[in-house]
Amino acid sequence: MTIKHTQDLAQIRAMVPEMRRVKAIHFIGIGGAGMSGIAEVLLNEGYQISGSDLAANAVTDRLADKGATIFIGHEAHNVAHASVVVVSTAINEQNPEIQAAREKRIPIVRRAEMLAELMRFRHGIAVAGTHGKTTTTALVTQIYSEAGLDPTFVNGGLVKSAGTNARLGSSRILIAEADESDASFLHLQPMVTIVTNIEADHMDTYGGDFENLKQTFIDFLHNLPFYGQAILCIDDPVIRELIPRVSRQVITYGFSEDADVRIENYRQNGQQGQFTVVRKGKANLDITLNIPGRHNALNAAAAIAVATEDDIRDEAILRAMANTQGTGRRFDHLGEFETGNGVAMLVDDYGHHPTEVDVTIKAARNGWAEKRLVMIFQPHRYTRTRDLYDDFANVLEQVDVLIMLDVYAAGEKPIAGADGRSLCRTIRSRGKIDPIFVPDSQTLPSVLANILQDGDLVLTQGAGDVGKVARHLAALELNIGRMQQI
């Protein structure tokens, strides 16, 4: 089912009071997934929304169509009429809009603080973890929508069935992705929290101390009220280690024998996964999940655990799993194309951590074992490439053909030896595959044209602008003749 939306602003106002004296809200970096989602919900709640970003995109265009004022570029006068300014973590203190807001004594809040305000008068369901947050948030949203509960949701990526990454619903339920990258999720005070897994990522935030990261997750779980619920993946060794330190009700899920919500008999058939979910005191569920991979079965089990605790009908759960369209850039099937030399399949995926890349490769192998796997990989951030260098090399050498783009810096300065060329050299020296380094993504189509074979699965992978490369390849329909002309 496509997620439907009904709302009555007067009804919502009765549940969620207006922020006192706040009329106009300005977002610096409004084009990002997390920022735009909050902006869209607040816009639909009746606030005057403005925002700025360095470039227009589909998100800013949609917000403008809905009535937001969008500025391209950051200028001091953009905040002239703001009651409050919301900033993303990507914005530094030298930004002229931040400086102007400080001079005018306009309150400046982080994205998570505004999300916390949205959650304050609602039944909040927060989804945290190193991997799987976006898909799990979408699956929870799909279930509650199938059950007719019309939730508000704010996700870090496109919920395909809704056609947006955020929406204001008419019920008191708010489902939100919680971001640990800057520890700002500590502002949130949900009723239910899912934690999918905990790995070393964004370690600059935590002083390079993994114990600090683990304690921050514990602190986040203790933001739950005493009657709240922690839905935790017991397959994850770090989470299993931390469970005794969680002083809230814990419900576990996973493939493990001791999981409260247990996955059995997983098998994959192309784009679909099929498995049984065993629940304590409830009937088993035979699930058909319309997105591939064991990792997505875990994401589904988390959503099912939450829904089961909320007494949502099994029929709604089963429909949601079978009908989900997934999320944007998560094993996103862009098509199968006649290339001029046979047929090739194109998939785009956002995964940019070695664990995420690994599970994507496994999903591709399990669903399309006969296909040659051609990966176009773009490392994301020099610090991540440096910190997880060997892990990246170990994972990337599993593909059949590797085309490597250079690092998407995301504002970071280059780090010697932590770039695409170095990673290629390391992988090549191991002798399993011979990676191809492409420093300019504009030349990639012509490089791919000389490699493509009948039956290939082409997988674009990464969190930077490689998604645009994927869309360009789809527009070219992987046609060898057209790609050679680029």
Swiss-Prot record:
GO terms for cellular component: cytoplasm. Its EC number is 6.3.2.8. One of its GO terms (molecular function) is ATP binding. It comes from the Bacteria. Pathway: Cell wall biogenesis; peptidoglycan biosynthesis. It is found in: Cytoplasm. Its main location: cytoplasm. Keywords: ATP-binding, Cell cycle, Cell division, Cell shape, Cell wall biogenesis/degradation, Cytoplasm, Ligase, Nucleotide-binding, Peptidoglycan synthesis. ATP binds at G129, T130, H131, G132, K133, T134, T135. GO terms for biological process: cell division; cell wall organization; peptidoglycan biosynthetic process; regulation of cell shape. It catalyses: UDP-N-acetyl-alpha-D-muramate + L-alanine + ATP = UDP-N-acetyl-alpha-D-muramoyl-L-alanine + ADP + phosphate + H(+). InterPro entries: Mur-like_cat_sf, Mur_ligase_C, Mur_ligase_C_dom_sf, Mur_ligase_cen, Mur_ligase_N, MurCDEF_pg_biosynth, UDP-N-AcMur_Ala_ligase_MurC. Belongs to the MurCDEF family. Cell wall formation. This is UDP-N-acetylmuramate--L-alanine ligase. It comes from Vibrio cholerae serotype O1 (strain ATCC 39315 / El Tor Inaba N16961). The gene is murC.
